[in-house]
Amino acid sequence: MHIDVIGHGPALVLLHGWALHGGVFAPLVERLAPHYQLHLVDLPGHGFSRDDSTPLALPYVVAEIAAATPPAVWLGWSLGGLFALHAAATLPQVRGLAMIAATPRFVRGSDWPSAVQREVFVQFGVELSRDYRGTLERFLALDTLGSAHARSELRSLRETLTARGEPAPEALQQGLTLLERTDLRRTVPQLARPSLWIAGQRDRLVPAAGMHAAAALSPHAQALTIAGGGHAPFLGHADQVSEALQRFVASVP
């Protein structure tokens, strides 16, 4: 699995969202690299890990990342949040957890109302097999929908998407399955490490209310909503997100 290591200081592992790669965090890298050693992961089937045959399953991926990185705060955006949360719940080397636009369960349920309908991910899976590039474009548009900086964020995501080659279709299907079926809510109250949950106020994929509901499950959590932010608030609101991360990491024992 490809992992870029940039900067010096306390370690921070960053895990990207569906169809992207570690390069998507460029605005955060610019601001955080002077203070931290950043470990930017390309998940299997994505970016420079496109040919990595590791199944996109939480235990396998987390174990491989953990073996290649030092004790660190783990940050997960969107799909990457599921891997980061699983790591925080199972590995003592995870010092803290930062979740950006990510919850332990991405689909709506009778006891989890602030989420999207399951059919959203099912339909993306169907469309992906019919129209690969068109489906990716529609997903990127959904990532930025509602954001105060939607145009510039969409432009950035489009440029990033294929900068390291196109993601593997099989990995994309596996990622959609994870988003549709994973429910890690039971692990959150057991988190022994501090956590930070950063939501975008206008996020259409992971509503801010869902982020705050997730944070409320953890005994050591902070929650922050970025005003005007969409599903990728670290793009259009990089200063706010990086400042929040620096405050959080400084507070981690």
Curated annotation (Swiss-Prot):
Keyword Signal: no
Main location group: cytoplasm
Keyword Cytoplasm recorded: yes
Catalytic activity reported: 6-carboxyhexanoyl-[ACP] methyl ester + H2O = 6-carboxyhexanoyl-[ACP] + methanol + H(+)
Pfam families associated with the record: Abhydrolase_1
Residues engaged in binding substrate: W18, S78, L79, F139, L140, A141, L142, D143, H231
Keywords: Biotin biosynthesis, Cytoplasm, Hydrolase, Serine esterase
EC number(s) recorded for this UniProt protein: 3.1.1.85
Metabolic or biological pathway, per its Swiss-Prot or TrEMBL entry: Cofactor biosynthesis; biotin biosynthesis
Subcellular location field: Cytoplasm
Molecular function as annotated in GO: pimelyl-[acyl-carrier protein] methyl ester esterase activity
Biological processes per GO annotation: biotin biosynthetic process
Active site: S78 (nucleophile), D203, H231
Residue ranges the record marks as coiled coil: none
Annotated Gene Ontology cellular component terms: cytoplasm; membrane
Function field: The physiological role of BioH is to remove the methyl group introduced by BioC when the pimeloyl moiety is complete. It allows to synthesize pimeloyl-ACP via the fatty acid synthetic pathway through the hydrolysis of the ester bonds of pimeloyl-ACP esters.
Oligomer and partners: Monomer.
PANTHER family referenced in this protein's UniProt entry, alphabetically: AB HYDROLASE SUPERFAMILY PROTEIN YCLE (PTHR43798:SF31), MONOACYLGLYCEROL LIPASE (PTHR43798)
Family the UniProt entry places it in: Belongs to the AB hydrolase superfamily. Carboxylesterase BioH family.
NCBIfam families membership: bioH (TIGR01738)
Protein name: Pimeloyl-[acyl-carrier protein] methyl ester esterase
Species annotation: Xanthomonas axonopodis pv. citri (strain 306)
Organism lineage: Bacteria, Pseudomonadati, Pseudomonadota, Gammaproteobacteria, Lysobacterales
